[in-house]
């Protein structure tokens, strides 16, 4: 059965808000660096903890760090080195959107993930 899609922004926001967890994984894809793109023949791949990423947009642009965590529910990524100061001086991690970061080095500890990388689209 084909999924019916709408071009209305309110329905797109509603779809993302109400999406089940297994569908939200698709929202967590980030573009691959050019060397990884050539090696694996893929433009983007899902971000996991342990990947090395580079921030492409925002006030933290240019910072490169390891992914500390992935929030599937809110579709955000936590990167080591990307912090904001609270009023009391405490550093808290700043969640980033996966579309605003680029994967520069993949975490290849998971055999299933490596096998998925090798599959040509």
Curated annotation (Swiss-Prot):
Key words, A-Z: Ribonucleoprotein, Ribosomal protein, RNA-binding, rRNA-binding
InterPro entries assigned: KOW, Rib_uL2_dom2, Ribosomal_uL24_CS, Ribosomal_uL24_euk/arc, Ribosomal_uL24_KOW, Translation_prot_SH3-like_sf
Gene Ontology molecular function: rRNA binding; structural constituent of ribosome
Top-level taxon: Archaea
GO biological process, one term: translation
Coiled coil: none
The keyword Ribosomal protein is assigned to this record: yes
GO CC terms: large ribosomal subunit
Function as written in the Swiss-Prot or TrEMBL entry: One of two assembly initiator proteins, it binds directly to the 5'-end of the 23S rRNA, where it nucleates assembly of the 50S subunit. Located at the polypeptide exit tunnel on the outside of the subunit.
Family: Belongs to the universal ribosomal protein uL24 family.
Subunit structure: Part of the 50S ribosomal subunit.
The protein, known as: Large ribosomal subunit protein uL24
Natural source organism: Methanocorpusculum labreanum (strain ATCC 43576 / DSM 4855 / Z)
Gene that produces this protein: rpl24
């Amino acid at each position: 059965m084909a999924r019916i899609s709408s071009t209305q922004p309110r329905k797109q926001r509603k779809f993302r808000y109400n999406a089940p967890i297994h569908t939200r994984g698709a929202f967590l894809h980030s573009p691959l660096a050019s060397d990884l793109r050539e090696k694996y023949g893929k433009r983007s791949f899902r971000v996991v903890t342990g990947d090395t990423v580079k921030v492409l947009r925002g006030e933290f642009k240019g910072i490169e760090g390891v992914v500390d965590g992935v929030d599937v529910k809110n579709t955000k990524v936590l990167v080591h080195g990307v912090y904001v100061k609270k009023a009391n001086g405490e550093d808290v991690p700043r969640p980033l959107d996966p579309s605003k970061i680029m994967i520069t080095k993949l975490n290849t500890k998971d055999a299933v993930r490596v096998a998925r990388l090798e599959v040509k689209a």
